[in-house]
Amino acid sequence: KLMEDIYDRCQVLVLDAEGLQADRHAIKIVENNMEEDIDLILAVGAGTIHDISRYIAHNYKVPFISVPTAASGDGFVTTVAAMTLDGVKKTVPSVAPICVYADTDIFSKAPQRLTAAGISDLMAKYICLADWKIANLVTGEYFCCETVKLEEKALKTVKSSIQDITEGEEDECEQLMYALILSGLAMQMIGNSRPASCAEHQVTHLWDMEVINGPLDALHGEKVSVAALLVLEEYKRIAAAITQGRCHAKPYENEDEELL
């Protein structure tokens, strides 16, 4: 209802979803078509729309409001944007929304593929939290137990409701959206993306940059889920090698050194 009330007072830009990426091309399209005297940006859509919106809001020093239409990822309330700039995937400073309007009646009816991508993005947090703890043990990096507890509780709730979520049950879809927003808030609380993006996201960044592959017709959460499985297998291999005494962690001296 709020969006309907202000719709007539807004300039509306609809970006073609086909091949849309958070990159300079998309930024240029928006900048070439938006009015000069904007004082607020409404991001109505999923993850890519939000990355583009928060990046532009940061550059133009205006606030933005998040209106997620699908529970497809955890990037709705972060303070960084995942952008492909000059062929390189980067996490760049941006702004968090001043508020979020997530209508259950809308996002619970989103295409199942988008919702499944959100579940996948969330389940990869198990890898992120493990990575974070390892970094804490090896390098002394700050590790927030309270933040981890909040994320683990949300993960447990969603994990037990996956079937209901895929069937569009509103209460369970709300829990998924809550968990995704919480993941974004965790990044705000810590001041970086450590609680939500680690080894598995590094793999997806290489895919996004097409280092050894062509364009992929895959959603972010879909790529994250595959990457999480690949990372998990590699971690199992490393763990076995450590147990068997075939490799060990070196004392941490500086960030430029290889740790294994």
Predicted segments, located by residue:
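ATP/NTP phosphate-donor binding region
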Residues: 1-40
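Active-site histidine-anchored catalytic micro-motif
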Residues: 44, 73-77, 218, 222
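General beta-strand structural signal in soluble alpha/beta enzymes
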Residues: 13, 42-44, 65-67, 102, ...
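A glycine/threonine-rich phosphate-anchoring loop and its flanking beta-alpha core
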Residues: 59-157
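A short, small-residue-rich loop immediately preceding and capping a beta-strand
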Residues: 34-56, 60-69
